[in-house]
Design a protein with these regions (language model features):
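Extracellular and organelle-lumenal recognition/adhesion modules and their flexible linkers in secreted
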Residues: 3-318, 336, 353-369, 417, ...
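An active-site-proximal structural segment forming one wall of the substrate-binding cleft
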Residues: 218-221, 225-227, 254-274, 319-333, ...
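Noncatalytic carbohydrate-binding groove/subsite architecture in carbohydrate-active enzymes
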Residues: 220, 228-237, 241, 385, ...
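C-terminal beta-sandwich/jelly-roll accessory domains of carbohydrate-active enzymes
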Residues: 625-712
Length: 712
């Protein structure tokens, strides 16, 4: 690790001349339900369309939904021998007599919102049971015969067994049944793609004439991709609803105590050491139409009463994971929550934009109830005493302590008079009741230009105490060439105004990524170089997050994502690994430091030195964007003795991607020799003790963190 003097560079670290304080919330994550990240992803519940709500939307046919009552999305009919019968979707037997209706939806929206309050179940009408008649839940998968574009759960490509079970692991089953004139038995079991039973068989009989919840445990006999079979053995009629299957606690994040989350995906997030978590969008929180917005009250309380919806990205969000679970998720990661609420303006880039009317007194009352009061109630849900309405619900759900919400986003990539008029109403109402809440505003969808300038003009005049959410998806050159974007002397946008540290306005880089090369290693080098400048300007940029966070293999709406996964495993991109390396940070930067090549600055080495003022540990984050190895002489201004640990990633080939070679995922038919290998992973080297000056080799095309640990 100690290099000879070849192609040498040097850096001087003045440990006495401290620079800015690093924002304690600087490095975070942004979770959005995009790329099928939630249901069938980070949510460990294994049954797709478990409440049978994915039904046709009249006047807006979408292939992500069943198009007829006999086509049950994500399920297949089982008909053995000479069995004859029907299984159809119906709303004649609602599971809940008093389904909460928190919102008086706008009757002028093009979608019939009344339908979203319908409670569907399955009615079995069996003429002849033969050797068995029933349904099988296929889970979250995609068929080799699916003809539609990748990324959509269409009814004709969800018909293969895709419930990934592991030998010896138990799975907790829950379902509701109601009899009519059925007096037979119902058998429930796991079976693989060859029809071979893969668990014990649970038998339910003597059905009651009212909804009854049944629970059981199924232990997998083999590791396989399965379906859940529910099979009747006699003629008659009965009803089925709300079928869920959850892996045992050992397979869940924190054994299920922090929500129904997949352990492997959550561990990947925990390893990033996020300081904040933004959720649930993004465009997902705006929606493409009125009902497609995220309404938080529809996502809390008992899971049976939650109302799913077709999200902005064109598929179903069940809300099995709702705002309460998001808050638990953030808390379990040690991350400050940053939820985003809509203000009555849906995505302004979608085909059908909705703007909540304010023309009449009735309009203004509806706007207050659905958007303004809703935001105030949400803050009460997060922070309120248990004797308040929404604080009591939080306690009832299992969290009597407040979540200590500090930040709240209003809108996403919005712009224009309609947005700012509604933003103003919500901003003033929140600040009047909860002045301590920091509101996150928006610079729009672009990193510069008219929209960016117009939004900042509104913020400068009326909302200078907000954090401004800036988004940009750019190429390698942009990230290399804009490292000075937030420097104190840099002019912001086209208004001739600087990022003024004397004003309270701060920047939240809520979404950024190099999307030109789709997670190729070259994108990592450019992003990491840029990220060093964000950290060195974190007196202005107080939060930053890559986006998107997750993508399910074969279901990508976006081509550059931090973590790729399937039903069994995951791939961490090199973009992920540089963020993991860079999450190791001190709490204060050094005064400006450069890597020198003689008396010239090396323009291809990017650096951010920080120090932990309590432990004295020094962190030198460094990117070498050239293919040549460099010997770096590190000069310290003190005589302390240090141990040295360098962690790094590097690659001669900058086109490499840690996404796996396969097009889809482990359960896709015909896949052989499937693996979760990652081509590039962090390496480490340590040595010492060192004092004053020492040399270390920096690999070509590398992202490094050099940690200096004081010796006692």
């Amino acid at each position: 690790p100690i290099s000879a003097q070849k192609d040498s560079r040097s850096i001087y670290l003045n440990t006495k001349d401290k620079g800015i304080e690093i924002s304690p919330t600087f490095s975070g994550i942004f979770f959005e339900d995009i790329n099928n990240s939630l249901d069938g992803g980070i949510c460990a519940q294994l049954i797709q369309n478990f409440s049978f709500q994915q039904y046709m939307v009249p006047e807006a046919p979408a292939k992500e939904f069943s198009q007829a009552d006999s086509i049950i999305f994500g399920w297949s009919v089982i008909s053995k021998g000479d069995a004859k019968g029907k299984a159809i979707t119906t709303n004649e037997k609602p599971l809940l007599e008093n389904l909460p209706r928190y919102y008086d939806f706008d009757p002028n929206d093009r979608y019939n919102d009344e339908l979203r309050y319908q409670q569907y179940s399955i009615r079995f009408d069996i003429e002849n049971a033969g050797d068995g008649f029933g349904l099988a839940a296929n889970g979250y998968g995609i068929s080799e015969h699916g003809s539609e574009r990748a990324g959509h759960y269409y009814s004709n490509n969800t018909q293969i067994p895709s419930i990934a079970v592991n030998r010896g692991i138990s799975y907790d089953l829950s379902l509701y049944l109601q009899g009519a004139d059925y007096d037979g038995r119902i058998s429930i079991y796991l079976e693989d793609a060859q029809g071979k039973v893969n668990s014990e068989t649970i038998v339910i009989e003597n059905l009651k004439n009212s909804w009854t919840k049944h629970t059981a445990t199924l232990k997998a006999e083999r590791t396989a991709d399965c379906r859940l079979a529910i099979v009747a053995d006699k003629a008659g009629t009965f009803y089925l609803d709300f079928v869920t299957l959850m892996p045992e606690a050992s397979e869940l994040w924190m054994e299920g105590k922090a929500g129904p989350f997949r352990k492997d995906l959550m561990q990947a997030l925990a390893d990033l050491n996020p300081t904040f978590m933004r959720f649930p969008g993004g465009c997902a929180s705006e929606g493409t139409n009125y009902f497609g917005q995220v309404f938080w009250k529809n996502s809390v309380g008992d899971v049976e009463q939650r109302i799913g919806f077709r999200n902005h990205w064109g598929y179903w969000t069940s809300q099995y994971v709702g705002f309460y679970e998001y808050l638990l998720m953030a808390e379990s990661l040690g991350a400050t929550p940053l939820p985003v609420l809509n203000n009555g303006v849906t995505c302004q880039f979608a085909g059908h934009q909705y703007v909540a009317p304010l023309d009449t007194e009735e309009d203004r009352k509806r706007f207050y109830d659905i958007f303004v009061k809703d935001a105030l109630d949400f803050i009460e849900f997060c922070n309120g005493d248990t004797n308040t309405e929404w604080g009591a619900l939080r306690a009832e759900m299992g969290h009597p302590e407040p979540f200590n919400l500090k930040y709240l986003g209003i809108g996403n990539e919005n712009k224009g008079e309609a947005f700012w008029e509604r933003f103003d109403i919500m901003y003033n109402a929140i600040k009047e009741k909860y002045p301590e809440i920091i509101i996150v505003s928006t610079a729009g969808s672009a990193s510069d230009g008219k929209e960016f300038n117009d939004n900042y003009a509104q913020i400068d005049e009326k909302y200078p105490d907000t954090y401004v959410d800036e988004h940009y998806y750019k190429n390698d050159n942009w990230f290399y060439n804009n490292r000075d974007r937030y420097n104190a002397d840099k002019v912001r946008g086209g208004q001739g105004i600087k990022y003024d540290r004397e004003r309270p306005t701060r920047v939240f880089v809520g979404e950024f990524a190099n999307n030109a090369t789709n997670n190729a290693y070259a994108s990592t080098l450019a992003e990491a170089a840029y990220y060093t400048s964000l950290e060195q300007n974190s007196d202005m940029v107080v939060m930053a997050a890559y986006a998107p966070l997750f993508c399910k293999k074969g279901f990508n709406k976006w081509n550059s994502n931090l973590i790729w996964f399937d039903n069994r495993g995951l791939w961490r991109t090199t973009n992920y690994y540089y963020m993991k390396l860079f999450s190791k940070a001190g709490n204060r930067a050094f005064a400006a430091s450069n890597v020198m090549n003689g008396d010239q600055i090396d323009e291809h080495v990017y650096v951010s030195p920080t120090i932990d003022t309590e432990s004295g540990e020094i962190y030198l984050k460094l990117v070498n964007s050239e293919a040549v190895e460099k010997s770096l002489e590190i000069n310290l201004d003190n005589r302390n003795i240090y141990k040295v640990l360098m962690e790094y990633i590097s690659s001669e080939d900058t086109t490499v991607k840690n996404q796996g070679a396969q097009n889809y995922y482990s359960s896709y038919p015909g896949i052989v020799n499937f693996n979760y290998n990652e081509t590039i992973t962090p390496q480490s080297v340590g040595f010492g003790p060192v004092k004053k000056n020492f040399n270390i080799s920096i690999p070509g095309n590398s992202v490094c963190v050099i940690k200096l640990i004081p010796e006692e």
